[in-house]
Every structure is written in structure tokens, then in C-alpha cells.
UniProtKB/Swiss-Prot annotation:
Keywords, ordered alphabetically: Aminoacyl-tRNA synthetase, ATP-binding, Cytoplasm, Ligase, Metal-binding, Nucleotide-binding, Protein biosynthesis, Zinc
Record-given protein name: Methionine--tRNA ligase
Catalytic activity: tRNA(Met) + L-methionine + ATP = L-methionyl-tRNA(Met) + AMP + diphosphate
UniProt: Zn(2+) binding residues: 145, 148, 158, 161
Length: 550
């Protein structure tokens, strides 16, 4: 049985560049849709996200940009927070891994793993720059590929032949920043022995939700576990307590940011202990939303880190992965010019158009593609032609004919059948949301709009109006508005602005939105919402929901 308390997290966006449509549809829109749905169900939802602010890519790019590390991550933290707001992502708290609570809990995780014999130190050879007086991580190194001889190969892989290797395997290694020659020196690092938790991890993944095509990947990954270094020779990061001049690898500290971010949230609401009711209570339902490239860290490595703790931290119940979203057949890449400026896009097209199309093409089980042609087709055919047309024509007809106050009339069997079919589709939508399928939810939304359009066409109230059969006209309008009420409900998680407009225009007697936060509608998806017997509608002049995309 699902808990009344729901914890939701989505992969922390890396503070190293702007978010693109692929990021949004892969982790943040699905998490937002699920959060909105669960709030409608009356659940106590906490959706936590935040910036991932450590790691080699940040230090390297900050240095190349001539910026301080904190200055650099501050810039992208603000950008990501603003992007979430513009996209209507209803995150309850957007934290960051430079928050005040993060260092202590990361170091505590490390000590607990040490005490259980799961972290051990090992001396290895790493590349050292005499000129810079420090060890250099792979991203700071270039050299000659040991496989193909390409003389500008990166420190972790060759962009010429695709080979991957350790930076120390490069021939003639040199500093990417200064060009200085590098030498090998011994250095001590801590390693997490994941292979010692293999049986625990296999048992764990059998009990959680994974998309079927990901389960084999995760199981195979666990079967081939090996020790992983948890420390790096860097100055920017969380210091390692017992190793001088070392910080934790970003993959180790970042997922702990979900917990420290919740601590940050608890402090912000004036209840520092509130984080515990989500992270130290196993009756909580925890859903995590990520892109497929983060699967191993969230399905295996972070749960392994939690297994090794003295506190019973909540482990994920549902790990919801997405494949990649391509742009016109290619990966999103600002440097290659295959990129859409999100601000410019939203200045031209409404937010709900974008949210709907991204949800409808969500890469849930395979890579999918965003193209402007499909965006245009879906907006014009589905949002304007089906959805908006149904709402507008019903309300325009009602207002024109003075039928703006509607109450439960005498209904015929065909009306009851229509209401029953509408309710069935709304319940189907609930099932799709509960199973993390935005694509199926979008299909059901359009199916309900088409059902309403078909009913209105078949009953042809304009003909009945000419005959003076106003009781029947009002009955048809009542049923159509009831369908629109359900349409607004099932649309809200994906198209919140549009759903609210519909509810404002039909003004159901049973619904008082005045006391609710419109961005966090709560406890509406109830049996009473579906009851039509005592319902009334007070209709307003229709507002165009969607315009054509040229």
C-alpha cells in the first residue's frame, strides 16, 4: 500500500551549463508531473532538487572562463533555479551541494563506510605537474593516445579513435592548462568496495520499480562490481577527513545532496528535524527521476552507500529512468549549434504547449526526437484542433445562448453512458500517472477531449435550440462541462495553466480554489470530485486556450 507521504527527487543538474529540453524531459518534467499528480491525490509530497556543484568539469571550465569556483557555480545555480521557475517545475526546495549541511553528512557517510570495512585506502600512480605543484585529474591532461597515436587525446578517452584508458597510460602527457610535461608519482586514495555488497544490492533491486528494459542492465552491473575510488586530488570539493589535500569524488558526494538538500529545506521552514520524517521513515514512498546515464549511480552505488550507514536512510522505491531526447536526430549540444534557446522559445510559444509536447514524446523506453515540425503538428492538431476546440465551442455556444448557469438536469441513458466513459478515461489517466507514463497520460487526455467533441457533435444542441428544447440543451451543456471538469483534472499535472483556465471558465460549484496555491493544487482527485449529482457550473466568456503554431 502506498504511503501518504511521498519523497520525490530528480537528478541534481550539474552547475556547468544551461539546461536543455533533453534534461527537462528526462528528469525534471516527469518528476514535476508525478509531484502534481500525488498532491492532487491528497498525498504529503516533498519534491527536492538542487545544483550539483563540485567536480572536475566545474573547476576546469571555471579556470578556462577566468572565474572563481564559487562564482562559477553561483551563476549556474541561479540559472537553473530560474529555469525551473520558467518551466513551472513545482519543486518544493531547490538546494545545492555547497549548502551548509552537506560537508558533515558526506564525511559521516564516509566514516560509516570505513567502520564497516567497505572503504579502504590504496596507493596508486597519478600524473603530477611539477610546474603547478599538484596532481592533475584526467580532465586536466592531454597527450598522445596509447592506441592510435592521436597527439591531442583527452585524459580519459581519445576523441579520434574512441579508446578509453587511465590518464597515466597516455604517452607524453601534459597539462591542458599550461602545456607542462607531467610525471608519475605515488598518491593515496580511498576506494569503496562495492563488490562486498553484491548480494545485498541484488536483493535490493529486486524489490524496487525499474522500467523493464533497465532491470537487466542494473543486474548485470551489480554482477561486475569492482572497487571505485571515492577521492580525488583537487582543491574544490568536500575535504576527506583522513587524507590531506584530497576531496570526495563528485559521484560520491552528489547523491548525498538529496539528504543534505532536505536538511536545508527543513531549516528553511524553521523545523530542523523535519527532514527525518522523509529520510528516516521506511513507510515513505520514495521516487527518483533520472536520465539513463545516471542509472548505475542511483540504482547501485548510492543504495550501496546507504546500506553501509548507521542510520536507516530511506532507499528508493521507484527509480524512473528516461532515455535520451534528440534534437532533429542529433544530441543537444550548444557548442555544435544543435541547441534551442529556452528563453527565446518560451517568448514565442506558451509554456503548456512545450510541456505537453515534451510529455507526449517523452523518451521513456527508447530515445525520442524533438523536431519543430512535430511540435507544430501536435500543437495545431491536438491542442488547438481537439482540446481547445472542445472547450471553446461548448462555452461559446453556452454563453451565446444565455445558458451560463447549469445544474444537474434530467439525464438520458446516452448522457449517463458519456459520463461513465469520461470517468473511465480519467481513472485511466490516474493509472498512467501512477505508473510514470507521461506519453500514455497525454494520449488519454486527447482521448477524453475527442470523446467530449464527439458527444457534442452527436447531440447537436444548436439544432435543439432552434426547436426550443432548452431542457435538453442544458443537459447536453451540463454533461459537456462535466467532461471539461475531468479534462482539467487529468491535464493539470502536465498543463497546469490550461487546467486552471478551464476550471475558472466553468466554475464548478463543488470546487473552491480560492484557498489553494494554484501551483500546488491539493486533494482534488477524490470521489466527490467525480460526483455529478449535485454539481453546478457558472460559465464565463471563453478564453482561447491555444493558438495555431505557424
Amino acid at each position: 500500500m502506498e504511503s501518504s507521504r511521498i519523497l520525490i527527487t530528480s537528478a541534481l543538474p550539474y552547475a556547468n551549463g544551461p539546461l536543455h529540453f533533453g534534461h527537462i524531459t528526462g528528469a525534471y518534467l516527469p518528476a514535476d508531473v508525478y509531484a502534481r499528480f500525488q498532491r492532487l491525490q491528497g498525498k504529503e509530497v516533498l519534491y527536492i532538487c538542487g545544483s550539483d556543484e563540485y567536480g572536475i568539469a566545474i573547476t576546469l571550465n571555471a579556470e578556462l572562463a577566468g572565474m572563481g569556483y564559487q562564482e562559477y557555480v553561483d551563476m549556474y545555480h541561479k540559472l537553473h533555479k530560474d529555469t525551473f521557475k520558467k518551466l513551472g517545475i513545482s519543486v518544493d526546495f531547490f538546494s545545492r551541494t555547497t549548502n551548509a549541511y552537506h560537508p558533515a553528512i558526506v564525511q559521516d557517510f564516509y566514516r560509516n563506510l570505513q567502520e564497516r570495512g567497505l572503504v579502504e585506502n590504496q596507493v596508486t600512480e597519478q600524473l603530477y605537474s611539477e610546474e603547478e605543484g599538484k596532481f592533475l585529474a584526467d580532465r586536466y591532461v592531454v597527450g598522445t593516445c596509447p592506441k592510435c597515436g592521436f597527439d591531442r587525446a583527452r585524459g580519459d578517452e581519445c576523441q579520434q579513435c574512441g579508446a578509453d584508458y587511465e590518464a597515466r597510460d597516455l604517452k607524453e602527457p601534459r597539462s591542458k592548462l599550461t602545456g607542462a610535461a607531467l610525471s608519475l608519482r605515488d598518491t593515496e586514495h580511498a576506494y569503496l568496495h562495492l563488490e562486498r555488497m553484491k548480494e545485498d544490492l541484488l536483493a535490493f533491486v529486486q524489490g524496487i520499480y525499474l522500467r523493464p528494459h533497465m532491470r537487466n542492465f542494473v543486474t548485470d552491473y551489480i554482477e561486475h562490481l569492482r572497487p571505485r575510488a571515492v577521492t580525488r586530488d583537487l582543491s574544490w570539493g568536500i575535504p576527506v577527513p583522513d587524507l590531506e589535500n584530497k576531496v570526495f569524488y563528485v559521484w560520491f558526494d552528489a547523491p548525498i545532496g538529496y539528504i543534505s538538500g532536505t536538511m536545508d529545506w527543513a531549516a528553511s521552514i524553521g523545523d530542523p528535524e523535519a527532514w527525518k520524517k522523509f529520510w528516516l521513515d521506511d513507510t515513505v514512498t520514495y521516487a527518483q527521476f533520472i536520465g539513463k546515464d545516471n542509472t548505475s549511480f542511483h540504482a547501485v552505488i548510492f543504495p550501496a552507500m546507504e546500506i553501509g550507514q548507521s542510520l536507516p536512510y530511506k532507499k528508493v522505491d521507484a527509480l524512473v529512468t528516461s532515455e535520451f531526447l534528440l534534437l532533429e536526430g542529433f544530441q543537444f549540444s550548444k557548442s555544435d549549434g544543435n541547441f534551442i534557446d529556452m528563453d527565446a522559445f518560451l517568448e514565442t510559444y506558451s509554456l503548456d504547449k512545450l510541456r505537453y509536447v515534451l510529455a507526449a514524446i517523452a523518451p521513456e523506453t527508447s530515445d525520442s526526437e524533438f523536431s519543430f515540425q512535430e511540435f507544430k503538428t501536435r500543437c495545431n492538431s491536438e491542442l488547438v484542433g481537439k482540446y481547445g476546440n472542445f472547450v471553446n465551442r461548448v462555452l461559446a455556444f453556452a454563453v451565446k445562448n444565455g445558458c451560463t448557469e447549469l445544474s444537474s438536469p434530467q439525464l438520458e441513458q446516452k448522457d449517463l453512458d458519456f459520463i461513465s466513459k469520461s470517468q473511465k478515461l480519467a481513472k485511466d489517466a490516474a493509472e498512467h500517472y501512477a505508473q510514470y507514463s507521461l506519453r500514455k497520460a497525454c494520449s488519454t487526455i486527447m482521448e477524453l477531449a475527442a470523446l467530449g467533441n464527439g458527444y457534442f457533435n452527436d447531440e447537436a444542441p444548436w439544432k435543439l435550440a432552434k426547436e426550443g428544447n432548452w431542457n435538453r440543451v442544458r443537459a447536453i451543456l451540463f454533461c459537456a462541462c462535466y467532461c471539461q471538469k475531468l479534462l482539467a483534472l487529468i491535464s493539470y499535472p502536465i498543463m497546469p495553466e490550461t487546467a486552471l483556465k478551464i476550471l475558472e471558465m466553468i466554475a464548478p460549484y463543488s470546487l473552491d480554489l480560492g484557498s489553494q496555491d494554484p501551483d500546488r493544487l491539493h486533494s482534488l482527485w477524490t470521489d466527490s470530485f467525480f460526483d455529478y449529482s449535485e454539481e453546478k457550473f457558472s460559465l464565463k466568456e471563453p478564453e482561447l486556450l491555444f493558438t495555431m503554431v505557424e
